[in-house]
A protein has these predicted regions:
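Mature catalytic domains of secreted/periplasmic carbohydrate-active enzymes
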Residues: 19-441
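Sec/Tat signal peptide C-region and signal peptidase I cleavage site
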Residues: 14-18
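Sec-dependent N-terminal signal peptides
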Residues: 4-13
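Positively charged n-region of N-terminal signal peptides that target proteins for export
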Residues: 1-4, 88
Length: 441
């Protein structure tokens, strides 16, 4: 009898852990995603009213009843979805990811699963995701929905995780009810807004043990297989990613990195180099220092910083998802609009070296990265003080090297896999000097 039980348990385990097989549409969507290279991240919610970032409920220990007053002040009458989409498109972005529901538990869409949403609780009373979805379709921009697995508002997000412990006024509900709630909302997002690009999960890390260096054991069951299967059933092409800072789980279609180029390890919570999988990659970064609107945030990144980060992301084989935090009136800060316009001008001129490329043959550094496509390798020289470049162990067979966008040849020598390139001082660009290598395939 025991032997039979063991066999049944083993069989069940194999079934439950069966390797996820993406559909043909999903694989095509992955390729599109890798080719797209650049997207707009939008963190927007009722927290913008306070002008202190998207974590204000946690950081200021605002109680549930106190936070419930915020939606009454949220009336973004200057929100223009088409204007946002055109801003992204003119910046060279191919997709938009927007917060449908952040950690504060407030839904930015009309939901039957919870009355705590923009349509039912704000004077604005409109579904901003619906308006954005329509504008994205009109202008051929894909739309992804950010969805928080962490919730500082609901009673049934229980047991609590590591954050939000100072927020009072919540009961002790049932975890299975929370899972059902998430499934209901995800079903709405995948059925009421047309064809979407995918779901961008965040917050799983809240339930993981943390020793200051690595995430450890998880304390609850997020029912990932059930949730991921539901998403792929409703929209097989939809891409799933999760900002859990760990190796990808079965069912995920791309791997994301927060404020950290893949494998670089500049953040405490950075994903280990050993945990980088074979999925398409995406790094998200802020245009200033905050995700949600922050009135006092003056850390606006320069044109050079933003463009070089896009280039570096491509050199690491990754997309860049660049974030803005709109104001509570529905407008985006003028400084951020201007920054996106500058990126757009650069990418119109040099986008060929970014779009549809893959990681190049050299290990990326802060001074030099490479991208490649169609028999071309593009060297991006980010250090304007360099006049000579030496690349050891470069075993590609070179036909010629020229400055990208011109016919001017670049002097070089290539002996015993040691490549030396001699730059013309007059051709060095302060942001990015791009060399086009014609490679024998």
């Amino acid at each position: 009898m025991k032997k039979h039980i063991l066999i049944i348990l083993l069989f069940t385990s194999i079934i439950n852990n069966a390797q996820y097989k993406p559909s043909k549409e999903n694989l095509e969507a992955r390729k599109w995603f890798q080719d797209a290279k650049f997207g707009l991240f939008i963190h927007w919610g009722v927290y913008s009213v306070l002008g202190d970032g998207e974590w204000v409920m946690n950081n200021q220990n605002i109680s549930k009843s106190e936070y419930e007053r915020l939606p009454k002040f949220f009336n973004p009458t200057k929100y223009d979805a088409e204007k946002w989409v055109l801003m992204a498109k003119n910046a060279g972005m191919k997709y938009i990811t927007i917060t449908s529901r952040h950690h504060d538990g407030f839904s930015m869409f009309d939901s039957n699963a919870s009355d705590y949403n923009i349509v039912k609780k704000t004077p604005y009373g409109k579904d901003i995701l619906k308006l954005l979805a329509e504008a994205c379709r009109k202008h051929d921009i894909k739309l992804f929905f950010y969805y928080s697995q962490l919730d500082w508002y609901r009673d049934d997000y229980f047991p609590r995780g590591r954050t939000g412990l100072g927020i009072n006024g919540r009961g002790e509900g049932k975890w299975e009810n929370y899972i059902d709630f998430m499934k209901a909302q995800l079903t709405e997002l995948l059925t009421n807004y047309g064809k979407i690009g995918g779901i961008w999960f965040d917050g799983q890390w809240d339930q993981h043990e943390w020793d200051g260096k690595r995430f450890g054991k998880i304390n609850v069951d997020f029912k990932l297989k059930e949730v991921y299967d539901l998403i792929h059933k409703l929209q097989p092409h939809a891409l799933i990613g999760s900002n859990h800072h760990l190796a990808p789980n079965p069912g995920e279609d791309f791997q994301m990195f927060e404020k950290d180029l893949p494998g670089k390890g500049t953040k405490d919570f950075a994903t280990s180099k050993n945990d980088i999988g074979n999925l398409p990659l995406e790094v998200c970064e802020t245009i200033n220092g905050s995700w949600g609107f922050n009135l006092k945030d003056r850390k606006h990144k320069s044109e050079k910083e933003l463009i070089q980060y896009l280039i570096k992301a491509a050199g690491y084989g990754s997309n860049l998802l660049l974030n803005v935090g709109p104001m509570p009136n529905g407008e985006i800060q003028e400084e951020h609009i201007n920054s996106l316009e500058k990126i757009g001008k650069w990418i119109k001129k040099f986008g060929e070296t970014i779009y549809h490329t893959r990681k190049g043959p050299i290990d990326p550094t802060d001074q030099l990265v490479s991208t490649r496509k169609d028999g071309k390798v593009f060297l991006h020289v980010l250090d304007s003080s360099k006049e000579n470049i030496v690349l050891e162990n470069f075993d590609e067979k070179i036909r010629s090297i020229k400055y990208f966008g011109s016919n001017q040849k670049v002097k070089y020598s290539h002996k015993k896999n040691s490549l030396k390139i001699y730059l013309d001082k007059e051709k060095i660009n302060n942001i990015d000097t791009i060399l086009e290598l014609d490679i024998k395939i």
